[in-house]
């Protein structure tokens, strides 16, 4: 298969993975309207082409939370990444480090913090959920500190799990799920050998280290479902802000007022995100929500964005809409599933090349130059029309 874009990696991942895993990463909540709009709304963002601007001094590097990034991209936290490639979190972290960008480890990773952090030379980020078991949260934060994690990404848009209908059809959940997953694995021998057999243990490493016993895929939904905390409020995060002295990013912001609350709370950054369309179907896409949030808090904290980003062109679009950097989720998992660390490295190379083309043809010499001026007049008017 010829690989020239993230969509090619998606096709390769679908061919290689058992359906329950492919559809788990590919699907969204309910009828998946927001999932689709994340991509289509971003694709509708028209840029303003400029010519004869002497673009010989193009620069993609940027500073974020005291780190130098080769480009304004970080790999997003994705649960169960280690089920998509053998010790997948380690491979993805190495790919990110090789391309000079951060990797964010999920709370529900297969590989624990202590396995991933020593595998790379640059600092790692860590994502944490708001859970009822505060002992687990404190334990995870202590272990993250000990492992040299620099930035905490705090996910707040999961007080309860989203309803993902596709999971029931694919075998991730629903009737006879275990049997269906086993049959799917048997019919995908390359994955079964490389990940199913050689990729063991299939464990949620960060959770089992706290519980003192293995926590496999079957426990994933049950343990998390019992521990999501619908009573959480900003005041409940105060002890975390006191405990964690490094940069803290609040992930899951879609409303300007919530963004202002994050500023008042003392967050160092936010992620404008609808969880990749996996939580509440029918909410705004990140691309539609971003301009109003940027108008409200730009300059008071760092604004990151995710959901729907599939190319370097999409990265430039998000920056023009008001983001300082982006998180890349599904796209890197497709590449990881298809070709491991090399696949993720190649995807990041493609994204960098696409960014260079977009910046050259919009006359933006550096990341700091990418602003609303890079948007077409039609796009700017549309963004103004949906601002609260």
Swiss-Prot record:
Keyword GTP-binding in record: no
Catalytic reaction(s) noted: (S)-lactate + A = pyruvate + AH2
Gene3D superfamilies named among the record's database cross-references: Aldolase class I (3.20.20.70)
UniProt cross-references to PROSITE patterns, sorted A to Z: FMN_HYDROXY_ACID_DH_1 (PS00557), FMN_HYDROXY_ACID_DH_2 (PS51349)
Organism of provenance: Xanthomonas axonopodis pv. citri (strain 306)
GO BP: aerobic respiration; lactate metabolic process
SUPFAM superfamilies reported in the protein's UniProt record: FMN-linked oxidoreductases
Record GO terms (molecular function): FMN binding; L-lactate dehydrogenase activity
EC number: 1.1.-.-
Main localization, broad class: membrane
Compartments reported by the entry: Cell inner membrane
Active site, per annotation: 275
Protein residues bound to substrate: 24, 129, 164, 278
Span of domain FMN hydroxy acid dehydrogenase: 1-380
GO cellular component, one term: plasma membrane
Enzymatic class: oxidoreductase
Organism domain of life: Bacteria
Signal peptide: none
Name of the gene: lldD
PANTHER family in alphabetical order: L-LACTATE DEHYDROGENASE, S -2-HYDROXY-ACID OXIDASE-RELATED
CDD domains, per the entry: alpha_hydroxyacid_oxid_FMN (cd02809)
Protein name, entry field: L-lactate dehydrogenase
Described purpose of this protein according to its UniProt entry: Catalyzes the conversion of L-lactate to pyruvate. Is coupled to the respiratory chain.
